[in-house]
């Protein structure tokens, strides 16, 4: 298969090693490593054995009571939420190399990270069987999707024509082939109004009418769990009818939600403080826009505040969320604070590993991520109905109820 993962890449990913760490382990040059990586040279002998042993040592031991796949995985926010209720990830797809590094550092796996999802939607048998599909696919207008006049002859033929060329199409292809018991899709709130509402309408039509799933959606804000105003839409689908009612799920009140001070580090490197030049520029830029009646501008937050939405552009100047420093210029959030703001770690919990990539890349990754406690909430909300759905399935998964019955 074009673009298929080589043995070298698969094993060093399974072992949780970067390219450089892998070639140091097997004691070969970079040029030899690149040949292994591209498939031009065959990995064999002692080098193969060393990587196999390293990969075997890192295989996750917990089987999980259901199997899920993680598409457009980013740095694993959806995964963390569904591992929380006892799921086991059996396949990951993420094209960005830096996100792959962060993901690999934080998830000990016995499977590699697939790159371009199109090779898997074209050959869905490459994806293992699973009960749940998770996907945070990018938002794209279907009005721009390429439709072949020769094939359509002026008529629509379901999602193959309506969504061709978009990443939702690849997701739909995989759902259509594997028919998982359930799926959870995540996107920005504006998906509902994107392209005049056409995008969301088409997605729901494809999922309900073309794929035959029972689908509901809901926008949930992150404020009850983290000190950030971040709204995201979650689309939940079950293959068979259930009593799940997304609109009836009780979301905690944001009134008693955490404040910014709860996630701030005590000792912060001065490099995160804005330069005098940048701070003056941002202040002048804000005044200019306010005079013109625009709302754009930098925002400074104190320890008792809840921030705006962290975006992937945060690395540029940090203007959307600046931390007040009495007696000094404000500062950016640190990457560690971004991890906490997105719920990837708790202050006294297990640290989220932030190595091998630059601050710029980490800001982008967290700005594109989901808020983990929100995903945990969604996962816990559908868990009883997922157990119900899987009780009729005849795979190797054992639900918590079955596990208890079996002693």
Per-segment meaning from a language model:
Residues 14-24:
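Short, charged amphipathic recognition helices of the HTH superfamily
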Residues 27-42:
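Recognition helix of helix-turn-helix/homeodomain-like DNA-binding domains
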């Amino acid at each position: 298969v074009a673009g298929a993962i080589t043995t070298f890449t698969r094993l060093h990913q399974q072992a949780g090693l970067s390219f450089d760490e892998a070639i140091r382990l097997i004691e070969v040059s970079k040029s030899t490593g690149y040949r292994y990586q591209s498939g031009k040279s065959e990995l064999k002998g002692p080098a193969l054995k060393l990587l196999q042993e390293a990969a075997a040592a890192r295989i996750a031991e917990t089987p999980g009571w259901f199997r899920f796949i993680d598409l457009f995985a980013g740095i694993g926010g959806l995964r963390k939420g569904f591992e929380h209720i006892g799921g086991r990830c059996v396949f990951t797809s993420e094209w960005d190399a830096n996100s792959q590094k962060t993901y690999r550092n934080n998830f000990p796996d016995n499977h590699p990270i697939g790159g371009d999802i199109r090779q898997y939607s074209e050959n869905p048998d490459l994806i293992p069987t699973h009960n749940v599909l998770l996907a945070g696919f990018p938002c794209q207008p279907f009005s721009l999707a390429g439709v072949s006049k020769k094939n359509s002859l002026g008529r629509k033929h379901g999602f193959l024509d309506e969504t061709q060329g978009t990443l939702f199409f690849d997701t739909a292809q995989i759902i259509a082939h594997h028919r998982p018991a359930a799926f959870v899709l995540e996107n920005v709130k504006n998906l509902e109004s994107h392209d005049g509402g056409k995008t969301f309408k088409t997605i729901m039509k494809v999922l309900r009418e073309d794929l035959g799933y029972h689908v509901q959606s809901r926008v949930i804000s992150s404020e009850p769990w983290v000190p950030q105003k971040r709204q995201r839409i979650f689309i939940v689908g079950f293959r068979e009818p259930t009593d799940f009612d997304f609109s009836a799920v009780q979301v905690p009140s944001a009134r008693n939600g955490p404040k910014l001070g709860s996630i701030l580090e005590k000792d912060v490197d001065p490099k995160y403080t804005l330069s005098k030049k940048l701070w003056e520029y941002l202040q002048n830029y804000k005044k200019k826009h306010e005079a013109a009646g625009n709302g754009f501008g930098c925002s400074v937050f104190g320890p008792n505040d809840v921030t705006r939405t962290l975006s992937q552009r945060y690395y540029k100047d940090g203007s959307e969320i600046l931390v007040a420093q009495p007696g000094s210029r404000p500062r950016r959030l640190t990457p560690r604070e971004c991890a906490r703001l997105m719920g990837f770690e708790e202050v006294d919990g297990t640290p989220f590993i932030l190595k091998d990539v630059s601050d710029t890349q980490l800001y982008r990754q967290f700005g594109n991520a989901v808020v983990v406690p929100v995903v945990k909430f969604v996962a816990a909300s559908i868990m009883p109905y997922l157990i119900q759905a899987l009780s009729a399935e005849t795979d190797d998964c054992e639900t918590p109820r079955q596990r208890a019955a079996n002693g």
